[in-house]
Structure formats: C-alpha cells, structure tokens
Amino acid sequence: MGNDKTNMFVAIALSLVVLLGWHYFVTGPASERQRQAVQSQTAQNTAPQSADGIPSPSPREGSPNAPVPGTVPGAAAQGPISREDALARSARVRIDTPALYGSIGLKGARIDDVSLKNYHETVSDESPRIVLLSPAGSANPYYAEFGWVGANAGPLPNGDTLWKADGDLLAPGKPLTLTWDNGQGLLFKRIVAVDDKFMFTVRDEVENSSANPVTLYPYSLVSRWGKPQTQGYYVLHEGLIGVLGSDGLQEYTYDKVGKEPAYGGAATQGKAWSNVTGGWVGITDKYWAAAAIPDQDKPFTGAFTERTDGATKIYQTSVRGDAVTVAPSASSATTQRLFAGAKEVNQINAYERDLGIKQFDLMIDWGWFWFLTKPMFRALDFFYHLLGNFGVSILLVTLILKIFFLPIANRSYVSMAKMKAVQPEMTSIRERYKDDRTKQQQAMMELYKKEKINPVAGCWPVLIQIPVFFALYKVLFITIEMRHAPFFGWIHDLAAPDPTSIMNLFGLLPFAAPDFIHLGVWPIIMGITMFIQMKMNPAPPDPVQAQVFAFMPIVFTFMLGSFPAGLVIYWAWNNTLSVIQQYIIMRRNGVKVELWDNLRGMFKRGNKSAAAKG
C-alpha cells in the first residue's frame, strides 16, 4: 500500500509539473502574444518617417557623449510603404552569398535588406524565404548601421549620406568599398566584406586632409522599429541581448528596456555599460538574430534603448568605441562586425572560436540548465550527422540514456519485483493490524528490511525522466536545427505538434479540429504505451488510486497533443523501452507479469457490465 501511494504521489507530482509548466510557459503567454500582435500592427501602421523615409538625425549627434545616432524621434509622421518601394528609394549594391541575399543602400550605407536563402516560413520549399532585415520606410524597419560621431568635425556620415561604390555586388571574396567626402577635409571610406554564412566585416577609415586634428568615436548599432510579435514563451528570451565584458550576459525584453531610466534624450529610456572590453550587442528572435560586434580588444560603451515617437517604439542596441584622434595628413581605421542570420549552433560556436567573440554562444538561449540542454543537443546533432534524421537521433539517444541509467532503473525494478513477491505477506500484515496503523507500519518496515526492499525505489524511473524531458523540450524548442526537421511519414517538423487529428479521422473529414481537442497519431501511440506500462503492475487496492492511474494515460494523451512531435515520440519510445526492461527484470526475478491478467480483467469487467445492462 505504501509503495502504491508513493508511486501515485510521484505520478501526480509529475503530471502537475508538466501541466503547470506547460500552462506557465506555453498556454499562459498565448493572450500576451495576441495583445502584442495588435500592438505591433498598430505601431506598424503609424511608424514615423521623414519625408524621404529615413529617420532624421538627432540634434545632439555632434556631442561625443550623446547616444549613437540612427533611430531617433522627431521625424514627420508618414505611413509605411511596401518593402519593395522602400528599397527602390535608393540605389543599391546587391548582396549574394550561399546563405544570404539582399542589398545595401547607397543612401546611408545601412545593411537593411537581408533575407535567408535556406530558410522558409513553412516546411514547404515553395513558401517565402525568411526576411530578416528591412529598410526604414517599410512596415517593419530593422537594420544595422555603422559610422562615426564627434564634435567639431564638420559633417559626418548619417542616414542621408550618399556614398559612392566601387562595384555592384557584395559576395564572399568580393568586398565592397564605399567612399564619401564631407567637403571639409575628411574622406570616409567603408570596406564591407561578407563570409559564406552570416557574418559581415565592416572596416571604417577616415583620412584627414584638413589643417586641424579631429576627434571621432566609431559606433555600430542594430535598430528595430515597432515591437515585433514575439513567441511569448518564458523559456525563451526574445528582445535585446548582449555580452558586456565583465558584466556578462544581459537580456532585456522589449517591455523591460522601456522601464529603464531616461537615457540621452527626450522620450528615450535605456541602460549603458561603460568601459567594456569584449562582447557584443544585438536583437534576437527565436531562431534569428542581428548583432553588432566591436573590436574585442578595445574598450567600448554598450547601450540598450527604447525611444518613443508617437505610437511607435524604436528599440536599439549600440556600441560606441573610445575616441580616435586623426591628425592632419593622417588616417585612422576601425573594424567591427555584424552577425545577421540564423542561430545555427555549430556556426555560432565557430564564430566564437575563430573570431574570438566573447561568449557568442549565449546568443542561443540554453537556459539555466544549459549543462543538460547543451549535451543533449550535441548528442542529437552527432547522431543526426551520422544518420541524417533527427527523429532517429532522438530514438537512439533515448536508448543510450536508458542504458546509462540502467543500474538505477534495474535496482528500482528489482525492488518493485520483490515488493510484488511479498504482496501476500503485506496483505496479511494489513489484515492483522488493520486497527493499529502504528504497528502496521512497523511490521511493514521490518518486512522491507528483512527482504531488502526500498519502498520508494519505484519512483526513480519516473524522476529520471523529468530532467531528460525538459532538456529535450528545450532543445526542440530553441534550436533552429530542429525547425522543420522531418521524421518519417506525416511528421515533417519535429518541433511542431503532430499535424494529424483523430477528430477529423486523420484528415479524411474536410475540417480542421480545434487546437484544444487536437489529438494526433503519435500522442495516441504515447497514450497506449503509457497505458501498457501502468498495466504491468497490479491495480492499487484503493479505488481512488486505481481511478487516478486509470485516467492518467488519457490525461497525458490529450495534454501531449499540443507538444512538439519530437517530444511525444521520445515519450512513447521511452515508455516502450521501460515496458521491455520491466518485463525482463520481473521474469528474471520470478515475479508474475500482471499485464495480460489486467488486460483480460478489463475485458471481463466490460462484458459483465454489458450483460448486466442487457
């Protein structure tokens, strides 16, 4: 009885953990996402622009202590135009790499047109490709900008500057050189290079042919107009992100940055980190990001800001380097980088290693339990490259974990088998001391000690699943490698729920089942394996416990209907391995397997009920 209660409490606890976790992390934020969608649409429909669609420069740009320019309030209000029309406002240099395509506008020289060649909006290759960066003037401006700020230096490059280009294509191995003369003795040159993935290298040079020295501060920024529609999950950070030297990782949601004190000007809030060496700043989505990366050996000031212009929120992450003094007839240069692309784990790690970018791997939100999620991903990725299928990798990693935890599980199942072997003695003790609970418990403990039985050993197989379950869930949820990763048959995306539904006979009926009753094939398979696993043991003598155990497979089947298919496949496979393992151990210890008797008993009860009604 004690063991049955313990198992029941553990099962209920696990159910509550999963149910509450799912509500807190997934269903709870659904209303928040809807609210954000409305706000985002409103903001996009009223995005402020200047007459030519480019944000006006701040009147404080000349001050070396001012925030870097780029996205500032005060522009004349004008509705957004189509992305294509916004791109057509300026002559452009084409970007073409194996991973990216887009363009750089010669007006402002912003990197503001980037799409990802290898990623589509849906699993269909015919669906539109992912658009990451878009120009000012469009409905969703999102871009990177590089330049200089300074006092008493004359005109400096800004969003209205018309640059001259030495070519019409930016590609790997084919850098682009842009030049602009301010007419007062300063010649600005910008050399932009791009690799075959997602990294731009920007070298800004300034030549001083005037009679006076000038002091300039190099900057780079990533700017996003309007609050985007985020996933809204608490297990995932979306918003402003960066690593700021010894201050480490900084993550600010779109709401949080607006609650910071005033910074640098009217209608602007934010936070700055001064005298930082090593790091980066950017804006991240679930799968994509744009990040400005300064020279890792030179100090800089990093900042996160939110600026308000009418109904529009303008979010910006920026870095500003220390002062550079350029003497007459001298020149100076600074090199910065821009990451703009998909958060591929191995590529992010390679950039951190090869370019020496401080903690660039934190671009991916591994969470507090990174020591579980990272090894889980590495194992899945290893077998994926070996087998070519992430679904098969999940099955294989689950099998390896079963083998790894075999000693613990074996002791648990052996103890459970011994518990069943002494079931008659336990029943006798309960009958003998049914009126004295204290003596009953003492007799039970003596029996456990005599037979070397651990009454809570049966909890371990369940408890072991909890960290594995959440580690796999995190990997499926955050890593782009799992996005649109197929399994077999109808599973084309392991990171999405099983698309089939019993409510429309798995697609035979011409309607879509509502999400709250969506129940696919794999959740049903999982429920069946869980049902079989529970029928391996005799039914608890307590009717309440028996009902709880009877309904648990049904509850979990419906609950996991909205979980990622990869997670449901893991659970079903893990249940199957547990049944096989428990069956072998019970037979080895001479304990009767109750599965067939329990199944026959169900049918007999069903026949008796039918006969009674007849």
Swiss-Prot record:
Family stated for the protein in its record: Belongs to the OXA1/ALB3/YidC family. Type 1 subfamily.
Protein name listed in UniProt: Membrane protein insertase YidC
Membrane topology term: Multi-pass membrane protein
Transmembrane stretches, start-end: 8-28, 386-406, 460-480, 505-525, 549-569
Coiled coil: none
Organism annotation: Methylorubrum populi (strain ATCC BAA-705 / NCIMB 13946 / BJ001) (Methylobacterium populi)
Primary role: Required for the insertion and/or proper folding and/or complex formation of integral membrane proteins into the membrane. Involved in integration of membrane proteins that insert both dependently and independently of the Sec translocase complex, as well as at least some lipoproteins. Aids folding of multispanning membrane proteins.
One Pfam family per UniProt: 60KD_IMP
Matches recorded under Gene3D superfamilies: 2.70.98.90
CDD domains: 5TM_YidC_Alb3 (cd20070), EcYidC-like_peri (cd19961)
Keyword ATP-binding: no
Subunit structure: Interacts with the Sec translocase complex via SecD. Specifically interacts with transmembrane segments of nascent integral membrane proteins during membrane integration.
Locations listed in the record: Cell inner membrane
Positions with biased composition (Low complexity): 68-80
GO cellular component: plasma membrane
Polar residues bias: start-end ranges: 36-49
Biological process terms in GO annotation: protein insertion into membrane; protein transport
InterPro entries in alphabetical order: Membr_insert_YidC, Membr_insert_YidC_N, YidC/ALB3/OXA1/COX18, YidC/Oxa/ALB_C, YidC_ALB_C, YidC_periplasmic_sf
Keywords assigned: Cell inner membrane, Cell membrane, Chaperone, Membrane, Protein transport, Transmembrane, Transmembrane helix, Transport
Coarse class of the protein's main subcellular location: membrane
Region (Disordered): 35-80
